[in-house]
Regions:
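Conserved Hanks-type protein kinase catalytic core
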Residues: 70
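ATP-dependent carboxylate-activation loops
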Residues: 80
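Basic, Lys/Arg-enriched alpha-helical interface segments
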Residues: 1-64, 73-76, 84-107
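Portal/gating segments that form or line small-molecule/metal binding sites
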Residues: 67
Length: 107
């Protein structure tokens, strides 16, 4: 069975707001995760973030973006939050948003 990347509704809306090159990078990282699984995809594409959270890392000519996701049952990766990154560190607020959405989903 292969891995599947799913976006919650809020993350889909956030992804739609990204510039085209960052959306394309997101799709590429998602394809890598689906094809090889999260255990075999590492830096520079993904890295652990906090608790159960991981981040997809996208960069392009229009900036840097991140997508925070969590592994769920049934070889699913659920994207909880997508945002444009403006500072060196991942903003605490982005992590808190992802954790709140995870709690709502009760995965």
């Amino acid at each position: 069975m292969t891995w599947q990347v799913h976006l919650i509704e809020a993350a889909e809306k956030e992804l739609a707001l990204l510039p085209a090159d960052l959306k394309a990078r997101f799709l590429r990282v998602a394809e890598l995760l689906e094809a090889f699984g999260p255990q075999k995809v590492g830096l520079p594409h993904v890295r652990p973030l906090a608790s159960k959270l991981w981040e997809m890392r996208m960069s392009g000519k229009d900036g840097i973006a991140r997508a925070v996701y969590v592994a769920a049952k049934g070889q699913r990766l659920v994207v909880l939050h997508v945002f444009v990154k403006k500072t060196q560190a991942t903003p605490r607020r982005a992590i808190e948003t992802a954790l709140a959405r995870l709690k709502e989903l009760e995965l």
